[in-house]
């Protein structure tokens, strides 16, 4: 297109010759190269510039948000310009890392809370495919109301219009945000009028359930999933609100150990007719390195923890709010240095664009529903792969060579060419994965530039077992494999004897063992002369995470124990039963000791009130550093945050199981435990634990009393991981159930009823311990 003229005034140019445009979307970020040059009357070029540009439409149809005529969901996060070393001066490398991590986690939207970003970031969002809720620098915070003061009207309008003028040519901008927490904000009416003169995209304001004319979307912050006495809940807006699409501008407050029940939010959202999605608060913890240490080049302590500081490091007067709000700046789903967390694993799973369901173990078939708005699932851009595991060990890794293209918004059934034969002696699981492929066709944008070839962008796990491993939970359902059943045990050789409160013997390898009790409590356990425990099992209901702030919780980790059936030989075995009584729960433990050194510990819990956790704590002896576990992993997961964590066999160390959340708190849970193997490589001894029934576990070198702060609830208590004392013994939890995390550190759900520990009934698991020599064991941390 060529235009001529001599006018120096503003001129509008219409490109009438463009047709058959390839539209831009976050799924297919196709960009054109636009070259603009200025020539003189002799056709000599005076100046020129080149830019990337994408074409898309954004419209509202009733209560739906449409991009290029198709309904899309906002799978978003709120972001901040923050860097642990540079503070608010975020560099390009970190911005790029953020965008790539978000794409890998199926995040498709960034809300620039609460100010526009530097232009480089919009170019990245255009190129990699990320929708942007572009927010003006108008933030009053919480109970402030400057935007209703007419004296601020001109300044506010100026900020809004400058944002639109600067960023209107970026296809990534989905809609505009007038600002944040400015009250009724009457000044926004005139601002919206001026903004619409320059761009037609929707305009939004976080109007806290108020039906305001200057917002094209309805919005509020931190709703619960379902209605409560003081919160209308997301489900109440399934059809939109006030005739507008409903957008959750902030939800799932991710402070500390968090992001519970995200799946339930999205079950409601994706089944709605008027909810467009939401943005998690927020992307990254905003702590920085301790400046005093940073100037000396010190970023990590001797025990390997980062020298991160938080709001309470800048409060000089205890209990006085000086604007720093304790730990309240650390609400990220990644850490300050952008480390992937268990929280992000959950987000990736819940946000994924593919649903796997209706798996048939006999037919080896699975239904795949394509939830992309535009992108087909075809052999040009994806590979459908699978991995078969036997008791957690990989036994087959394959792919589907030919499959029919699955159109956007459509389902199809796919046959997996699984070759593994299953039997009734093991648990067989299959992980089905959708893996990205680099495009090879011309005129196709490289939508995978953020990922390596073969990256699994969506997945699910199903049971292949013929064995009934379930105790009532339906097997073969995505993410719910049921709980393991321990077969009856027969000792293979060995001998034992009982003397008073001690059972001792020799196993089938000639190794001696001894277990002693006092008043029903295990006091010592040795194998081949080596200590296995530092403290025996006892009831423990204590937990402390940011989302528990609404609970006043003192430390509770002991019970009164009495012997109900004394230690005695019974045939070739020995048995003993004890009863324990603790606040809110009584329990019984039935011990069975086998000649080969195996010990069964069958525990039945009878709670009388709803607790944070129902389970036992114990301490393993120093040296048991190497860990292999068959449970959900590899990262920590909880009862309402395990959708993105699959059963598998993982190796690590106790030290590496720490979740380095900024403020120390309960960490490291792994749900649906089948087997745990602890190895002391120094002394050549190994202790295996197999599980029957429901159980989760965690391991730590840190005594949790170090972060038990009673009623302070982590707002002002100054505490860091590098302040804690690392003990040599291993603190272990074996829980029948731990309360779900919820997301109540700032509004939202405390814990949904499905994830609350029961306050009545009886609940049983069995732990089967087996010590053995480990001279040849060589477990490597991964």
Whereabouts are the PLM-identified features?
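Hydrophobic residues positioned within well-ordered beta-strands of beta-sheet architectures
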Residues: 1, 11-13, 34, 49-51, ...
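Beta-strand-rich binding/interaction modules
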Residues: 1-11, 365-402, 413-416, 425-437
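Extended acidic/polar, glycine-enriched regions
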Residues: 1-61, 422-424, 428-442, 447-480, ...
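An acidic-aromatic substrate-binding cleft motif
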Residues: 22, 31, 45-109, 114-117, ...
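Beta-strand/loop-rich accessory regions of lumenal/periplasmic or secreted enzymes
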Residues: 25, 417-425, 440, 465-782
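Short coil-to-beta strand junction motifs in C2/discoidin
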Residues: 28-30, 377-384, 611-614
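Extended substrate-binding grooves/exosites of carbohydrate-active enzymes
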Residues: 45-367, 371-378, 385-396
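Repeat-solenoid scaffold signature
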Residues: 184-187, 254-275, 402-467
């Amino acid at each position: 297109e060529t235009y001529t003229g001599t006018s120096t005034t503003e001129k509008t140019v219409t490109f009438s010759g463009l047709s058959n445009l390839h539209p831009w979307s976050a799924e297919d970020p196709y960009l054109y190269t636009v070259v603009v040059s200025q020539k003189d009357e002799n056709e000599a070029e005076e100046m020129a510039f080149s830019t990337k540009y994408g074409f898309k439409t954004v419209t509202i149809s009733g209560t739906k948000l449409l991009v290029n005529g198709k309904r899309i969901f906002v799978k978003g996060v709120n972001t901040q310009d923050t860097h642990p070393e540079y503070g608010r001066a975020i560099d390009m490398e970190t911005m790029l890392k953020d965008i790539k991590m978000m794409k890998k986690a199926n995040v498709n939207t960034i809300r620039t809370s609460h100010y526009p970003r530097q232009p480089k970031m919009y170019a990245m969002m255009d190129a990699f495919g990320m929708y942007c809720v572009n927010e003006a620098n108008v933030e009053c915070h919480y109970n402030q109301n400057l935007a209703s003061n007419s004296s601020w009207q001109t300044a506010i309008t100026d900020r809004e219009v400058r944002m639109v003028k600067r960023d209107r040519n970026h296809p990534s901008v989905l809609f505009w945000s007038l600002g944040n927490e400015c009250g009724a904000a009457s000044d926004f009416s005139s601002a919206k009028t001026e903004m619409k003169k320059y761009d037609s995209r929707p305009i939004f304001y976080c109007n806290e359930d108020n039906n305001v004319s200057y917002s094209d979307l309805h919005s509020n912050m931190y709703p619960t999933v379902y209605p409560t006495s003081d919160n209308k809940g997301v489900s109440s807006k399934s059809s939109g609100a006030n005739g507008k699409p409903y957008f959750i501008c902030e939800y799932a407050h991710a402070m500390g150990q968090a992001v519970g029940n995200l799946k339930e939010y999205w079950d409601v959202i994706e089944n709605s007719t008027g909810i467009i999605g939401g943005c998690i608060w927020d992307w990254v913890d905003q702590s920085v390195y301790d400046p005093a240490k940073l100037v000396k080049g010190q970023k990590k302590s001797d025990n390997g923890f980062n020298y991160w500081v938080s709001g309470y490091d800048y409060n000089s007067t205890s209990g006085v709010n000086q604007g720093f709000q304790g730990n309240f700046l650390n609400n990220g789903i990644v850490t300050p240095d952008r480390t992937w967390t268990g929280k992000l694993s959950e987000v990736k799973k819940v946000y994924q664009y593919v649903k796997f369901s209706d798996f048939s173990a006999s037919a080896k078939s699975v239904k795949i529903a394509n939830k992309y708005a535009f992108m087909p699932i075809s052999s040009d851009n994806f590979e459908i792969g699978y991995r078969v595991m036997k008791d957690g060990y990989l036994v087959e890794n394959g792919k589907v060579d030919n499959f029919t293209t699955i159109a956007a918004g459509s389902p199809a059934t796919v046959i997996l060419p699984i070759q593994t034969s299953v039997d009734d002696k093991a648990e067989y699981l299959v992980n089905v994965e959708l893996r990205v492929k680099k495009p090879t066709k011309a005129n196709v944008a490289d939508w995978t530039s953020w990922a390596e070839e073969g990256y699994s962008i969506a997945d699910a796990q199903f049971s292949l077992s013929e064995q009934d491993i379930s105790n009532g939970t339906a097997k073969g359902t995505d993410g719910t494999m049921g709980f393991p059943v321990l077969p009856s045990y027969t000792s293979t050789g060995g001998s034992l004897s009982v003397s008073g409160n001690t059972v001792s013997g020799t196993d089938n390898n000639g190794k001696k063992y001894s277990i002693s009790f006092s008043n029903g409590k295990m006091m010592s356990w040795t194998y081949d002369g080596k200590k296995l425990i530092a403290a025996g099992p006892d009831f423990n209901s204590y937990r402390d995470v940011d989302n528990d702030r609404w609970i006043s919780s003192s430390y509770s980790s002991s019970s009164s124990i009495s012997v109900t059936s004394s230690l005695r030989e019974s045939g070739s075995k020995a048995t003993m039963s004890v009863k324990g009584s603790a606040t809110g729960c009584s329990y019984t433990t039935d011990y069975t000791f086998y000649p080969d050194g195996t010990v069964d510990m069958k525990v039945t819990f009878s709670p009388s009130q709803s607790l944070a956790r129902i389970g036992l704590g114990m301490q393993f002896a120093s040296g048991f550093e190497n860990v292999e576990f068959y449970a959900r992993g590899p990262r920590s997961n909880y009862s309402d945050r395990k959708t993105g964590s699959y059963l598998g066999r993982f190796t690590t160390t106790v030290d590496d199981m720490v979740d380095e959340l900024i403020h120390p708190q309960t960490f490291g849970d792994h749900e649906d435990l089948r087997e745990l193997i602890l190895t002391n490589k120094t002394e050549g001894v190994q202790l295996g634990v197999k599980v029957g029934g429901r159980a989760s576990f965690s391991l730590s070198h840190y005594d949790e009393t170090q972060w038990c702060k009673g009623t302070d609830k982590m707002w002002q208590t100054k505490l860091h991981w590098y302040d804690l004392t690392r003990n040599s013994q291993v603190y272990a939890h074996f829980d029948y159930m731990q309360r779900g995390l919820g997301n109540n550190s700032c509004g939202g759900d405390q814990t949904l009823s499905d994830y609350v520990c029961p306050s009545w009934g009886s609940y049983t698991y069995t732990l089967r311990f087996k010590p053995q020599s480990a001279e040849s064991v060589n477990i490597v941390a991964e």
